[in-house]
């Protein structure tokens, strides 16, 4: 069965430098979702967002921009901006679990407000021809939230819905709710992408067997912890390359060089790399 692998957007990690380094060194990812754009009521696209989406910074990559918002006018503003850059799709983040987002009624904190979701999508589809896709969790407090919102989403021509099979208040703790994801499959007509705890080839195979109708798989933290994972899944192998260490060092050095050139000061650079090292360390026993 053919399938696609997608890189889940992770703030502070999967920027264009990471995307390019991973694609050039390892490959395996079909589509990269860019970390979300957040306007905070100001209709200005920050320079960091601009750099991340510039076509010249994403040459040879399939990239989908993402927005996090609870306001239709913000959505339309960003939709117009990314269309000017040549993008045809905008992903709407209803998945972010962090309190600083959810307390503002955004990310997974918006899933239980079906009326607001309906109002935003209705206005966006009336005033823009951009293709809309969704990135969601099962809810914030419980997995019934998404089940209540899916009938609303079914009334719109969404490209797909990528679902991280946790609720927001879990953050990344505890296990994924596979029964909750199955209920989504049974409830919606939309194409669903699975996201959550794909951290090894064995785990991917397990999920494929569990959800045989799913052909699109999104990898988040597992991709940062093990950048070899997508290509190993695609090649259907459990074996790492013989030159694993050399390949990883080249990947690491590419990232370090690029962040050294773009960030100011040793402290800033080391902090950036430290967060990456926290994930990288999971793939090495020593």
Question: What is the role of each PLM region?
Answer:
Residues 1-286:
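Flavin-dependent oxidoreductase catalytic cores
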């Amino acid at each position: 069965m053919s399938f696609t692998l997608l890189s889940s957007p992770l703030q502070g990690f999967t920027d264009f430098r990471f995307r390019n380094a991973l694609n050039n060194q390892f490959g395996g990812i079909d589509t990269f979702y860019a970390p979300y754009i957040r306007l905070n009521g100001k209709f200005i696209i920050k320079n960091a967002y601009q750099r991340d989406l510039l076509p010249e910074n994403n040459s040879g990559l399939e990239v989908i921009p993402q927005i996090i918002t609870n306001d239709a006018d913000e959505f339309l503003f960003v939709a117009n901006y990314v269309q000017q850059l040549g993008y045809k799709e905008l992903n709407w983040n209803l998945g972010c679990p962090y309190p600083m987002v959810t307390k503002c009624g955004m990310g997974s904190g918006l899933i239980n407000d079906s009326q607001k979701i309906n109002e935003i999508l209705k206005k966006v589809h009336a005033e823009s021809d951009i293709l809309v896709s969704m990135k969601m969790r099962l809810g914030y407090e419980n997995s019934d939230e998404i089940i209540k919102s899916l009938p609303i989403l079914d009334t719109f021509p969404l490209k797909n819905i990528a679902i991280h099979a946790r609720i927001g208040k879990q953050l990344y703790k505890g296990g994924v709710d596979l029964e909750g994801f199955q209920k989504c499959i049974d409830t919606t007509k939309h194409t669903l992408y699975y996201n959550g705890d794909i951290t090894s080839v064995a785990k991917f195979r397990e999920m494929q067997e569990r959800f045989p109708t799913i052909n699109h798989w999104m990898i988040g933290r597992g991709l940062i912890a093990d950048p070899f994972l997508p290509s190993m899944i695609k090649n259907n192998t459990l074996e790492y390359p013989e030159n694993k260490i050399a390949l990883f060092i080249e990947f690491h050095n590419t990232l370090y060089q690029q962040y050294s050139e773009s960030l100011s000061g040793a402290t800033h650079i080391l902090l950036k790399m430290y967060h990456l090292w926290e994930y990288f360390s999971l793939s090495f026993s020593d």
